[in-house]
């Protein structure tokens, strides 16, 4: 798996990820003649993933396991997760895990051209996932209110440390911070010793699992109402 490369003029550069989990994401059913067939429950659902590191990408990975088409938008140089922790053959094991079952396109959201291509993608999407600091998508004119007129059925999943509003909304929201603030680390470890961080980023992974569940429920409800939703998930 090669690191993402810059793509001139905002053109799409799609690369399928390795390690697809075809059997994991399949539901086995019996056909009319008794033959076994497989169907993925999220087949036909297009997800645009905006976000980096763990919570957003893990949400996209879960939806991809179950058949969704996940298009990951990465900045020039790629998601930092590609080089996070231990790296093998130019790519981290973390990215090999959370980048599978996805397509990837490099777009610079700090440029108008990059935002324009992203906006066109969001108009065709069923779901968008983002885990930027609250207000960032609105600054780029890519927030829910900006996209809704052209795509009223869009399900917009937002993951942040402390929520989209409130006194802490603009504070850095990494799981390592919110786990400590919530007291989770205090209850781990040994008596009379400092708090201990678990060997997995639970703030990110639990938020992502709840985000994937929320997206799935919103898809079910959209079949009844034809309306999209905005979901707010937090680490704390």
Please report, for each region that a protein language model flagged, where it lies by residue:
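Intrinsically disordered, low-complexity polyampholyte segments enriched for Lys and acidic residues
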Residues: 2, 9, 32-33
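Intrinsically disordered, low-complexity regions enriched in Ser/Pro/Gly/Gln/His and often acidic
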Residues: 3-6, 77
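Residue-level detector of conserved catalytic or cofactor/ligand-binding positions
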Residues: 5, 232-235
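Low-acidity, Ser/Thr- and Arg-rich intrinsically disordered low-complexity segments
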Residues: 6, 11, 15-20, 25-26
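N-terminal helix-loop segment corresponding to the beta1-alpha1 unit
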Residues: 22-226, 234
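Flexible, acidic loop-helix segments that line cofactor/substrate-binding pockets
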Residues: 229
């Amino acid at each position: 798996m090669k690191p993402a490369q810059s793509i001139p003029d905002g053109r799409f550069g799609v690369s399928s990820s390795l390690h697809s989990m075809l059997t994991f994401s399949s539901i086995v059913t019996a056909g009319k003649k008794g033959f076994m067939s497989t169907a993925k429950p999220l087949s036909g659902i297009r997800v645009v993933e905006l976000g980096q590191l763990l919570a957003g990408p893990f949400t996209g990975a879960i939806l991809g396991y179950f058949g969704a088409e996940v298009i990951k938008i990465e900045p020039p140089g790629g998601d930092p997760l590609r080089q996070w922790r231990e790296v093998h053959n130019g790519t981290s094991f973390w990215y090999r895990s959370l980048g599978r079952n996805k397509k990837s396109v490099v777009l610079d959201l700090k440029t108008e051209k990059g935002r324009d291509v992203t906006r066109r993608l969001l108009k065709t999407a069923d779901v968008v996932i983002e885990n930027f600091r609250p207000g960032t998508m609105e600054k780029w004119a890519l927030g829910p209110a900006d996209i809704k007129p052209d795509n009223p059925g869009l399900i917009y999943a937002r993951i942040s440390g402390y929520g989209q509003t409130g006194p802490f909304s603009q504070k850095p929201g990494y799981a390592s911070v919110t786990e400590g603030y919530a007291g989770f680390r205090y209850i781990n470890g040994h008596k009379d010793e400092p708090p201990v961080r678990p060997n997995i980023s639970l703030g990110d992974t639990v938020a992502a699992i709840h985000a994937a569940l929320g997206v799935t429920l919103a898809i079910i409800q959209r079949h009844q109402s034809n309306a999209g939703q905005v979901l707010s998930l937090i680490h704390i």
